[in-house]
Amino acid sequence: RSRGLGDVYKRQGYAEHAAALTSSHFCSAERQYRFPLEYGGVRTPTAQWTVTGSGALILGASGNGPRVTMVTTGKIADAGITDANNMGAAMAPAAYETLKAHFADTGRTPDYYDLIVTGDLGKIGHAVVMRLFQDDGIDLTGLYTDCGLLIYDLEGQDVHAGGSGCGCSAAVLAGHLLKLLESGQIRRLLFAATGALMSPTASMQGESIPGICHAVAIETQVNT
């Protein structure tokens, strides 16, 4: 959202430079949304590991770096998931709806992009998005991945379903994906950050966890 809003402000002349930054912390997230580490609870296979990390992007009105060419603002999607240890499944429908809306609004097909990356769906959410597009007759194999799959070694580090948190997508985009764009390894990136409108109190009362997703297209070679 901050990347998208920053680009809007820049394009409308409200700002010459805008900073989009965020962070997350493992212990803080566990204590606030699940259980304190001292509790010693066993993590479920669907649980993800909140990234202790941060990332920042500087958006400018001019320059030669990668450009934000499209912004697709998502809408809330609620699949009825109530398990705070299965956030990937809770957020996946929102990612699917936003990506589908992006392709419909722009007239682009998935293969227009060199890489499509979601924020922090992890192994479970990534599989859900793949399946939803397969049901539409669209195969994203080899084209689509998720920051939660990229930031950790899932097997070697035993992080169960992968990484999560605001810092997950921010760190992967600022520290890895932008380098791919700048080096020319990829030229067109569709980045769809994911999130949840989650309240610990509502979750304890058994209420569902709605998801949200906003997408930005970042390109190094723009057709004019």
Predicted regions located by residue number:
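Flexible, glycine-rich active-site loops centered on histidine and acidic residues
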Residues: 16-50
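A short, acidic, amphipathic alpha-helical segment used as a generic capping/interface helix at domain edges
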Residues: 99-104, 170-182
